[in-house]
Amino acid sequence: MPLSGTPAPNKKRKSSKLIMELTGGGQESSGLNLGKKISVPRDVMLEELSLLTNRGSKMFKLRQMRVEKFIYENHPDVFSDSSMDHFQKFLPTVGGQLGTAGQGFSYSKSNGRGGSQAGGSGSAGQYGSDQQHHLGSGSGAGGTGGPAGQAGRGGAAGTAGVGETGSGDQAGGEGKHITVFKTYISPWERAMGVDPQQKMELGIDLLAYGAKAELPKYKSFNRTAMPYGGYEKASKRMTFQMPKFDLGPLLSEPLVLYNQNLSNRPSFNRTPIPWLSSGEPVDYNVDIGIPLDGETEEL
């Protein structure tokens, strides 16, 4: 008697699951730490450049040394501790606060509720547009933002000014608040003595900086056809006159005819005639009675 319906197919179990069950390492292998997966090629590139084992890394190191030498020779004030542009105070540290007089870097973590960050003392008008806030992945989304320094309901914190405190309110989780100040000054501005606090207030035009000296009036040698001395001197007539000298009587030169006897000229016809050494006539008898063979009946 046939069975009603089609039977279920016999599914084969995977060999990997069978091996894990037989060895008993299914639960232990799930907690195995295989290390950090390299996802950023920049770290690998910098590590290869620091090995100094190939030609490219050596060239990169020499280029770094040339750049440092150029900066040290042209801008020695950067390496002094008393300078405002000392770049070491702008380098961030892990979990700390760095910066003086309205400049620097602030970093903080907040667990759950009540995280805060602190920047340098300053006014919000100077660095308000350059301030950037980066929120971590644990911050909530969809809330309405409040004023500066206060947290939105169910969302991220509002934007705080420089020197103020911003608090985050997350629904259970960690969030990082990083405030980065743009304190980069170009070498042109540094050479002109521009203060970082005046960077946002001043608009410097490098072309209009300094007094312009009067250009010397050089003579133009363009392709325009201009005579030397200008058109005024060129319009005058030529004052040079040819000197007068007496011309002698014109004498006709006698015509020299070589081989005046034209009859003695050799003939270059196709008939092989020898050279004529004298004017005596030479007769040639040519038999032109060539018999003509007529056509026969066979042809």
Swiss-Prot record:
Keyword Transmembrane: no
Coiled coil regions, renumbered to chain: none
GO MF annotations, alphabetized: actin binding; actinin binding; FATZ binding; molecular condensate scaffold activity; protein serine/threonine phosphatase inhibitor activity; telethonin binding
Domain of life where this protein originates: Eukaryota
Region of interest (Disordered), ranges: 1-34, 102-174
Main location: nucleus
Disulfide bonds: none
Record-linked PANTHER family: MYOZENIN (PTHR15941), MYOZENIN-1 (PTHR15941:SF11)
Similarity comment: family membership: Belongs to the myozenin family.
Function statement: Myozenins may serve as intracellular binding proteins involved in linking Z-disk proteins such as alpha-actinin, gamma-filamin, TCAP/telethonin, LDB3/ZASP and localizing calcineurin signaling to the sarcomere. Plays an important role in the modulation of calcineurin signaling. May play a role in myofibrillogenesis.
Name under which the protein is recorded: Myozenin-1
Native source species: Homo sapiens (Human)
Lineage: Eukaryota, Metazoa, Chordata, Craniata, Vertebrata
